[in-house]
Structure formats: C-alpha cells, structure tokens
C-alpha cells in the first residue's frame, strides 16, 4: 500500500520530462493520475500506459493549460471521471529565451501564459473541488531562476518567481480549509525542453 493510495492527482504538462517523472512516482505510490499536455500524441499515450502499469487509473487529456475555459472543462471532466481531485501539480512550462533588449512581446506573453497563467487557471478550477473535500495539495513547479534570476531568461524567471508567490498566497488563503500549497524550485534538469536550450 502506497502513500497515495486512493488519491487522485492532476499533473499538468506531463506527457514527458519532469511532469512524467512526477506522474510515475505518484502512480508508484498508489495515486490515480490524470495528466494534461497540449496534445496527447505518442509520448502521451506511452505515458498513460506506463502510469497504468502500476495498477492505477490513468488518463491523458489534451488541453491548453494557458486557456481558462479549456482548463475549467478538463478539470470538470477529470472530477467526473476520477471522482476526486486530491493533488494538483502545476508543471506545464515552456522556455522562449532571449536577452531583454531582443525579446519580443510574443516571447514574453507565451512564457507567462503557459508557465504562470496556467497555474492560476488550474488552481482556480480545482479549488472549489478541494474546498468541498476539505483537503488538497497544490504543488507549483517553479525554478531556482525564479529565486535568483538568469540572464537571457527574464520571462522564464518572472514566470517562476510568480509561481512561488502564487503558492505562498494560496497557502495563506486556503490553509485553514485543509488545502496545502507549496512551490518546488529545482535547478537545471536535463529534459526534452532543456535539451533545446
């Protein structure tokens, strides 16, 4: 019996990379796992199979985490299909690096939308469910660059700093209702995304 037996976790951006590793670890601990990614392609289908191999319920959902309406729909669908939402991991993220003086508004907006707005979207959609359950755990995957900054990554750094502040604020708002919120700020991890840097 694992630490998360009977719990349902949502992990955003989990078809590969850090999100996939988190989803697999949760499944190994007995959690049912719903995960999202922009598309559920061969990577997503393979991830779904790998999660299910632990004997838990697993399903990947194609969803644009940066879109408020998409997020509300997918969270409601997950609640209907899984019965509860106990854990939310806001992991969806992208990079579009460049020096400030060369960065376009589109580069800035894309990173803030996927990395930070998506966390707001999912927290906003999951909070009423967790409040009715009187329990829940929200985890924002931030980054060490959200604490220290990094040249050429002002958009990414700002988005990750925002995720840290968001977690702190949500913890204060929802802690008395049995809902925890934390941010994790890892250093550089080799993934498909970082291989493109």
Give each language-model segment a name.
Residues 2-34:
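Canonical Rossmann dinucleotide-binding motif of NAD(H)/NADP(H)-dependent dehydrogenases/reductases
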Residues 31-46:
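Conserved glycine-rich Rossmann-like NAD(P)H-binding loop of the short-chain dehydrogenase/reductase
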Residues 41, 62-74, 105:
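The beta1-alpha1 cofactor-binding region of Rossmann-like NAD(H)/NADP(H)-dependent oxidoreductases
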Residues 99-100, 107-112:
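Substrate-binding pocket helix/loop in short-chain dehydrogenase/reductase
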Residues 123, 159, 167:
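Active-site helix of classical SDR
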Residues 128, 172-176:
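Alpha-helical segment proximal to the catalytic Tyr-Lys
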Residues 143:
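Residue(s) in the substrate-gating loop at a strand-loop-helix junction
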């Amino acid at each position: 019996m694992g630490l998360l037996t009977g719990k349902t976790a949502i992990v955003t951006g989990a078809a590969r990379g850090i999100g996939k590793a988190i989803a697999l670890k949760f499944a190994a601990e007995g959690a049912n796992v719903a995960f999202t990614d922009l598309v559920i392609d061969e990577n997503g289908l393979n991830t779904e199979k790998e999660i299910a191999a632990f004997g838990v319920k697993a399903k990947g959902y194609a969803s644009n985490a940066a879109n408020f309406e998409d997020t509300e729909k997918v969270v409601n669908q997950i609640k209907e299909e899984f019965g509860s939402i106990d854990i939310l991991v806001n992991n969806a993220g992208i990079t579009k690096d460049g020096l400030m003086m060369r960065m376009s508004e589109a580069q800035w907006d894309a990173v803030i939308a996927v990395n930070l707005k998506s966390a707001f979207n999912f927290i906003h959609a999951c909070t009423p469910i967790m409040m009715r359950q009187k329990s829940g755990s929200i985890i924002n995957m931030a980054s060490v660059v959200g604490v220290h900054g990094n040249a050429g990554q002002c958009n990414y750094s700002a988005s990750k700093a925002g995720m840290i502040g968001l977690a702190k604020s949500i913890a204060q708002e929802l802690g008395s209702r049995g809902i925890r919120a934390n941010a994790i700020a890892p250093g550089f991890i080799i993934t498909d995304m970082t291989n493109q840097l």
